[in-house]
């Protein structure tokens, strides 16, 4: 039997057969599985709901995610409690988290076999609403459940009240997620390997409210004055009843991403955010 370093689990972006990407993803998946075999790796597929056989998860060294950032976010959350690294092969639009393009996979796998790949470990969030617990890779968002009215969110740091946000909601982002929804809401970019939380209000009623960066050693709690929604990485939702507590802390397990040794964080920012480009090129 091959050792765990030679076993790769494969996640593929869930796509309906009528989606224009369905045929492309199906062909890419088949090509990836053949390539893994040619390069000496054992492989197995994970379905949309993850894996029911924990023996396969334990056997795998890492998980290949074929799709965009949404695919890898879902896979990272599924695998978080198993402490397994993931790497993304871009088949989506943005591809901020994905490590490589499809045509780079062969070289990436060869480097993986020879330990010429770097492992990045990022802070993840652990949230809890009463008996329900969950992980977030990018962010946890508290937002209005009803279309009308202002949501009041009381925020506490280590059980001490420090602010009340009045508006559409609040983003609690990881450094890795600071370039996602947080950035769209005019929150700050925090280096992806930092150990901190980013709190960014959504359309706050007060002009004095500003985003806040807190050290990850703090435990946070939030409650709202009316029923609200808690959204995890833009992919999962939970109900937060009026005056019910949402607790957030640093997860004891990190988010693990395999990346090329040549990947440079600031170069990625420059490319994805078009820094240094003229306004005509951006448009």
UniProtKB/Swiss-Prot annotation:
A Pfam entry, by short name: NAD_kinase_C
Binding site for NAD(+): 69-70, 138-139, 166, 168, 176, 179-184, 235
Localisation per UniProt entry: Cytoplasm
Keyword Kinase listed: yes
Cofactors (names): a divalent metal cation
Any one Gene Ontology molecular-function term assigned to this protein's record: NAD binding
Keyword ATP-binding set for record: yes
Catalytic site: 69 (proton acceptor)
Catalysis: reaction(s): NAD(+) + ATP = ADP + NADP(+) + H(+)
Record's function text: Involved in the regulation of the intracellular balance of NAD and NADP, and is a key enzyme in the biosynthesis of NADP. Catalyzes specifically the phosphorylation on 2'-hydroxyl of the adenosine moiety of NAD to yield NADP.
Name of the protein in its database record: NAD kinase
């Amino acid at each position: 039997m091959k050792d765990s370093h030679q076993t790769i689990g494969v996640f593929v972006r869930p796509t309906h057969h009528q989606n224009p990407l369905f045929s492309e993803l199906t062909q890419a998946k088949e090509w990836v599985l053949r390539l893994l075999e040619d390069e000496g790796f054992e492989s197995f597929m994970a379905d949309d709901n993850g894996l029911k056989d924990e023996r396969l998860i334990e056997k795998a060294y890492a998980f290949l995610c074929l799709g965009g950032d949404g695919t890898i976010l879902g896979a990272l959350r599924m695998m978080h409690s198993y402490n397994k690294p993931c790497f993304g092969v871009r088949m989506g639009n943005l591809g901020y988290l994905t490590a490589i393009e499809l045509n780079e996979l062969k070289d990436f796998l060869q480097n993986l076999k020879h330990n010429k790949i770097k492992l990045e470990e990022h802070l993840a969030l652990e949230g809890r609403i009463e008996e329900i617990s969950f992980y977030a890779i990018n962010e946890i968002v508290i937002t209005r459940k009803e279309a009308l009215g202002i949501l009041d969110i009381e925020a506490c740091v280590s059980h001490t009240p420090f602010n009340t946000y009045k508006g559409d909601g609040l983003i609690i982002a990881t450094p890795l997620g600071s370039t996602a929804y947080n950035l769209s809401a005019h929150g700050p970019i925090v280096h992806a390997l930092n150990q901190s939380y980013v709190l960014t209000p959504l359309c706050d009623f007060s002009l004095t409210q500003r985003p806040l960066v807190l050290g990850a050693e703090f435990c946070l709690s939030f409650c709202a004055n009316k029923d609200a929604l808690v959204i995890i990485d833009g992919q999962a939702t939970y109900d937060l009843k009026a005056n019910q507590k949402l607790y957030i802390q640093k997860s004891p397990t990190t988010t693990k991403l395999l990346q090329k040794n040549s990947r440079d964080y600031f170069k990625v920012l420059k490319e994805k955010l078009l820094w240094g480009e003229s306004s005509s090129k951006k448009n």
